[in-house]
Amino acid sequence: MHHDLVDVLIIEDESELARLHAELVQKHPRLRLAGMAASLAQARQLLHATPPQLVLLDNYLPDGKGVTLMT
């Protein structure tokens, strides 16, 4: 059985936490890191350019609450 990779976008403004999430994603055999964003503005650009299948979303970002991306 063939399984496609799941594209993951990490939205996190704390660089050390973002790096840790990225390492975990890259180590998982079924996940692929699609991108990383440290703000809502960056996240919106990435979401439109390459929509991921999974998002790891920080709710407290420098330019607003992450949950607003879901509306």
Kindly give the residue locations of the regions a language model identified.
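The feature encodes the CheY-like receiver
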Residues: 62
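Conserved acidic carboxylate
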Residues: 12
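Acidic catalytic/metal-coordinating carboxylates
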Residues: 39, 65-68
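Active-site residues of response regulator receiver
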Residues: 58-59
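Conserved Rossmann-like nucleotide-cofactor binding loop
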Residues: 16
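Non-catalytic signal-transmission and effector/linker regions of two-component phosphorelay proteins
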Residues: 1-7
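Charged docking surfaces used in two-component/phosphorelay signaling
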Residues: 19-23
